C-alpha cells in the first residue's frame, strides 16, 4: 500500500485545524500510521525545502516552518500521494478550489496550512527526514 507524508504547518496548528484535516483523510478511508507534533529544527526545515535553496523566498520558508509546532504524519492508502494532492489543493490560495484544504483554509502562499508529498519518492524522503527528527527528540 502506498504511503505519503502530510504535515499541518504552524499556521494550521495555531488555527486549530489539525482535527479537521485528519478527519478529511480518515473520511476518505485512509489510514494514519504515525503522527507527531514537533517544532522543526532549522536543519530539518532547510532539508525539507532543499529544492528551493537558491530561491529568494527560501529563508522565509525556513523561518515560517520553524516558527512553531507542526504535525508530521504518515498516511497510507491506495493512490494516497495523488489523491492527497487533490484534497490539499493548489499552493496559491487564490487558485485552490473550494472544498480543498487550501481552498477552504489557506490565506497566503507561504501560510497555506498543509504540506503533502508530491511523489512517492518525495514521500519516502520526507518520511525518513521528519520521523528521524521526531526520533531524535525522544529521550
Swiss-Prot record:
Main function: Major role in the synthesis of nucleoside triphosphates other than ATP. The ATP gamma phosphate is transferred to the NDP beta phosphate via a ping-pong mechanism, using a phosphorylated active-site intermediate.
Alphabetical list of CDD domains matching this protein: NDPk_I (cd04413)
HAMAP family: NDP_kinase
Annotated localization: Cytoplasm
BP terms from Gene Ontology: CTP biosynthetic process; GTP biosynthetic process; UTP biosynthetic process
PROSITE patterns from the UniProt entry: NDPK, NDPK_LIKE
A GO molecular-function descriptor: nucleoside diphosphate kinase activity
Main location, first listed in the record: cytoplasm
Substrates-to-products reaction catalysed: a 2'-deoxyribonucleoside 5'-diphosphate + ATP = a 2'-deoxyribonucleoside 5'-triphosphate + ADP; a ribonucleoside 5'-diphosphate + ATP = a ribonucleoside 5'-triphosphate + ADP
Family the entry assigns: Belongs to the NDK family.
The encoding gene: ndk
Domain of life, source organism: Bacteria
Name of this chain's protein: Nucleoside diphosphate kinase
EC number: 2.7.4.6
Keywords of this entry: ATP-binding, Cytoplasm, Kinase, Magnesium, Metal-binding, Nucleotide metabolism, Nucleotide-binding, Phosphoprotein, Transferase
Top EC class for this record: transferase
Amino acid at each position: 500500500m502506498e504511503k505519503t507524508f502530510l504535515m499541518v504547518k504552524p499556521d494550521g496548528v495555531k488555527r486549530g485545524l489539525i482535527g479537521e484535516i485528519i478527519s478529511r483523510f480518515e473520511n476518505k478511508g485512509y489510514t494514519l500510521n504515525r503522527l507527531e507534533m514537533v517544532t522543526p529544527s532549522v536543519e530539518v526545515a532547510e532539508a525539507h525545502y532543499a529544492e528551493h535553496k537558491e530561491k529568494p523566498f527560501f529563508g522565509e520558508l525556513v523561518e515560517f516552518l520553524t516558527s512553531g509546532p507542526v504535525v508530521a504524519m504518515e498516511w497510507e492508502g491506495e493512490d494516497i500521494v495523488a489523491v492527497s494532492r487533490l484534497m490539499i489543493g493548489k499552493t496559491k490560495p487564490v487558485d485552490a478550489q473550494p472544498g480543498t484544504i487550501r481552498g477552504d483554509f489557506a490565506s497566503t502562499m507561504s501560510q497555506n496550512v498543509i504540506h503533502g508529498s508530491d511523489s512517492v519518492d518525495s514521500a519516502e524522503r520526507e518520511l525518513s527526514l521528519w520521523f528521524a527528527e521526531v526520533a531524535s527528540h525522544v529521550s
